Amino acid sequence: MEEIRRYLQLERSQQHDFLYPLIFQEYIYAFAHDRGFSRSILLENENPGYDNKSSLLVMKRLITRMYQQNHFLISPNDFNQKNPFFAHNKNLYSQIIAEGFAFIVEIPFSLRLISEGKKKKIVKSQNLRSIHSIFPFLEDNFSYLNFVLDILIPHPVHVEILVQTLRYWVKDASSLHLLRFFLNKYWNSLITPKKASSSFSTRNQRLFVFLYNSHVSEYESSFVFLRNQSSHLGSTPFGVLLERIYFYGKIERLVNVFVKVKDFRANLWLVKEPCIHYIRYQRKFILASKGTSLFMNKWKCYLITFWQWHFSLWFYPRRIYINQLSNHSFAFLGYLSSLRMNPSVVRSQSLENAFLINNAIKKVDTLVPIIPMIASLAKAKFCNVFGHPISKPVRADLSDSNIIDRFGCICRNFSHYYSGSSKKKSLYRIKYILRLSCARTLARKHKSTVRTFLKKLGSELLEEFLLSEEDVLFLTFPKASPSLQGVYRSRIWYLDIISINDLVDHKSKF
């Protein structure tokens, strides 16, 4: 972001938060295109012609056309009508503008993160290294809890709600009108992943997540404030982590002593409420507690009433269930988490007698949801619905090394993201599907069988490339420091949480 700030020269325009002039700058689209390509999880470009056709010359021609009079006048009321600006090369120009504008709108959020980081004096490397620390938190705390309540937050009823959220940071009316145009045009595909076919919805989900996350953070800040005003519980300070696309707040247990004077006698009242753990990722949040089922039911009614009356978001109470952690698993961040009883037997012997003591230790299992993963791989044509690997159709001009590179990158991304799973059997099955699909794809290209092709190429080379645990620069961060290696030695969590939306949402498009 510092490099982008240097190129954008925001010192003059930042006083008024004018972002619209940046649409006419060439380097904006260069930054947006490079980031979109390097951030691609599976390097599977949905429109290969876009990357081939996009160049600096095309961007200059696009900016020239935008400067022409009456060619770039867009109204939110006529977004479905034909615009003379998009009459020529509609798909290419709309994709470039969508990426560039999504990059521009993120600037106020990024500047806000930088300023907050400087105020709190947060070290950047440590701030990024704890991206996946939510799972060690689950392992340390959820094993002592009893009930879990997972709720799916509804989408805003109208696109204007998200636009109003951005008005706190952007006072530029032209930028807000352009944002309103894009959101109105692609609103259905943004809130419904199955309909995501447009360039703005598939390549710029990051912008929608930023807007939605800032919108939900207003609910959460109000909720924490009201909770503190009406309860004896205290809450730890929290920050809205817009860049990491998840919010974490924890209300800690507190014991207050009240003195009631009656007949000159002091009675001590101890008020002790169970601890509440609150985690949210995008639209889904989880509320867990050590209290009783009645206590969780009160929280459920309180949350539903709070969201409906203060923010006009309608929940379906019958679809919200309170489950016991001992016999229920919940899906979060692409994992399937549950509590498992780990039995252990301790033999105690005295002078004459010996005793066997059975202890059951609760342990959090984080598993790879293999059924949704196979469904996603089948949708991407890596295997069939039964999990049998198949050859993936590729372009004839791709070289063997390029095909292996793509499959290897996909395999390493899965390996890095699910490196902390407690059972690796499902992960090994996914690797096997990708490895054999790569071999069948190469054999299909050379019009040969898999066995013949592997004998010719050498299976060691393919295994070494696909199963290597190299760090992917655009996905992972440096591993834990030597002082932390002894804490979580069995499981390693490291990845850029911005880059794993496709892995978290198994129904997304590979």
Curated annotation (Swiss-Prot):
Keywords, sorted A to Z: mRNA processing, Plastid, RNA-binding, tRNA processing
Cysteines paired by S-S bonds: none
An individual GO BP term: RNA splicing
One Gene Ontology CC term in the entry: chloroplast
Keyword Repressor: no
Top-level taxon of the source organism: Eukaryota
GO molecular function, one term: RNA binding
Localisation per UniProt entry: Plastid
InterPro entries: Domain_X (IPR024937), Maturase_MatK (IPR002866), Maturase_MatK_N (IPR024942)
Function of the molecule: Usually encoded in the trnK tRNA gene intron. Probably assists in splicing its own and other chloroplast group II introns.
Family per similarity comment: Belongs to the intron maturase 2 family. MatK subfamily.
UniProt xrefs under PANTHER family: MATURASE K
Name the record gives this protein: Maturase K
Species per Swiss-Prot/TrEMBL record: Bartsia alpina
Gene encoding the protein: matK
